[in-house]
Amino acid sequence: MIGKLKGLIDSYGEDFVILDVGGVGYQVHCSTRTLQHLPSPGEAAVLSIETYVREDQIKLFGFRTDQEREWFRLLQTVQGVGAKVALAVLGTLAPSDLANAIALRDKAAVARTPGVGPKVAERIVTELKDKAPAFANVDPAVVHLAGAVDDQRAPRPVADAISALVNLGYGQPQAAAAIASASRSAGEGAETAQLIRLGLKELAK
C-alpha cells in the first residue's frame, strides 16, 4: 500500500495530478481544493495517499494533510457517500471547516457541495456528529448548544433566538455562537427578545 508520495508535478487533469516519482508517473486523484494549492509543473510536491485496490484497477487519492485524508475516510463511512462525493465535500470545505460544520449541525454548509443534496448532507452531519468535535476548533459550549437545538432539547427562547438570527441572514454557526454567549451573559430564564439583542451585539463586535 502506498501511504505517501514525494516527487515533481508532471501535469494536471480535471480531477487528478500526475506526480513524477523517480521517473514513474503516478495519477493521483485530488479534491479541487488540493489541486488549487499544488505547485506548477516541474515543482516538488508531497501528498498523503489513500490507495484503493479493485479487481480491475488501482486508484490513488492524494491529500495535502493527514487530517484531510482522515476526513476522506470518515465521510465514506456514511451511507451513500463514496470516494467521488467525499472528494467533492473536501473540495468545498477545508477539513477544519467541515469539522466545525458537522459539530455545529450546519447541514446547509455541507449541502453547498455540488452533488450533495439535503438528505445526504443530513446523513453526513447525523452520522459523523460524534466524531467531528475532536477535529473542530469551536467552543464546546457552542457545540453543545447547536446539538441541543438540532435535537429539540434547547430551551424555546434559545432555539427561537438562533432561528431569528438565521432568518436575518447569519449562518447557523455564527448564530449559535452568538446566542451561546448571550445566554451566558443573560443567565437562565432569559427571554427570546433579550437573547436576540445580546446576540446581535455579540455579532457586531
UniProtKB/Swiss-Prot annotation:
Its main location: cytoplasm. It holds the Pfam family RuvA_C. Residues 144-154 are annotated as: Flexible linker. Residues 154-205 are annotated as: Domain III. Residues 65-143 are annotated as: Domain II. InterPro entries: DNA_helicase_Holl-junc_RuvA_I, Hlx-hairpin-Hlx_DNA-bd_motif, NA-bd_OB-fold, RuvA, RuvA_2-like, RuvA_C, RuvA_C_sf. Keywords: Cytoplasm, DNA damage, DNA recombination, DNA repair, DNA-binding. It is found in: Cytoplasm. GO terms for biological process: DNA recombination; DNA repair; SOS response. GO terms for cellular component: cytoplasm; Holliday junction helicase complex; Holliday junction resolvase complex. Residues 1-64 are annotated as: Domain I. One of its GO terms (molecular function) is four-way junction helicase activity. It comes from the Bacteria. Has three domains with a flexible linker between the domains II and III and assumes an 'L' shape. Domain III is highly mobile and contacts RuvB. Belongs to the RuvA family. Homotetramer. Forms an RuvA(8)-RuvB(12)-Holliday junction (HJ) complex. HJ DNA is sandwiched between 2 RuvA tetramers; dsDNA enters through RuvA and exits via RuvB. An RuvB hexamer assembles on each DNA strand where it exits the tetramer. Each RuvB hexamer is contacted by two RuvA subunits (via domain III) on 2 adjacent RuvB subunits; this complex drives branch migration. In the full resolvosome a probable DNA-RuvA(4)-RuvB(12)-RuvC(2) complex forms which resolves the HJ. HAMAP family: DNA_HJ_migration_RuvA. This is Holliday junction branch migration complex subunit RuvA. The gene is ruvA.
